[in-house]
Amino acid sequence: NSIKNPDIFIKTNIYGTWNLLNSAYKTWFLEPFLKKDEFKQSFFYQISTDEVYGSLGENGKFTEDNAYAPNSPYSASKASADMLVRSYHHTYGLNAVISNCSNNYGPFQHDEKLIPTIIRNALNNAQIPIYGDGKNIRDWLYVKDHCVAIESIYKYAFEKIKENNSFFDVFNIGTNEEWQNIDIANKICSYLDNVLPKNTSYKEQITFVKDRAGHDRRYAIDPTKLQRVIGWKAQENFNSGLDKTIQWYIKKYKG
């Protein structure tokens, strides 16, 4: 969507984030670096994405020290928003934390996303579109694990601000669960072959389509800092999380 219609992403992620930051500053502060007493422990939590780092080669993982190198209008808008958050901390003293997560999956995800699309099209006996050669790699994070990570980071930031009035930090949230898109499609089809068998395998519906513009080859998050500093660890591996996800979408799409 950001490739066909980037306007809404620019307005929401850049201008929208600036509106929130500016409102927070005007509400919380008397002047730069001087907070109102009732907002001493307030801070801004920016939830971002691993896409801001750009595309990786075959080796290595994104750490919090990686430079931003976004390659699509969406990732550029998120990178711009992150930079605005950073600027409000350094310019005005607004406490802030940024978390950059890997690909989320699980119940209630938007229908256009990869995993819901594979399941929905498989169940509807439609083509299952896979961009390019299907070998684009993503690090996958179950949505509930992401929620727990966000809560843990929030609590950590709140306690740190009690100790020190100035606070800014960045955390990557990932699971070291790297999967090619084609492998995900095959896993889902195999699952459906077992629980909802039909005359032919669902894998026969997989269709390779023209790659989309700006399609980064590989993302991979290094969550070491989050694990070391806060003690967070994902509770779902990709297999267990995907099983729960498929079961949820079968109920949604089949009733």
Could you describe each region identified by the protein language model?
Residues T63-E64, I115-T117:
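Short, hinge-like loop/turn segments at secondary-structure boundaries
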Residues N1-N104, N124, C147, I153, ...:
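N-terminal Rossmann-like NAD(P)+-binding domain of SDR-like oxidoreductases, especially those catalyzing
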Residues P116, A122-G255:
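C-terminal substrate-binding subdomain of Rossmann-fold SDR/epimerase-dehydratase oxidoreductases
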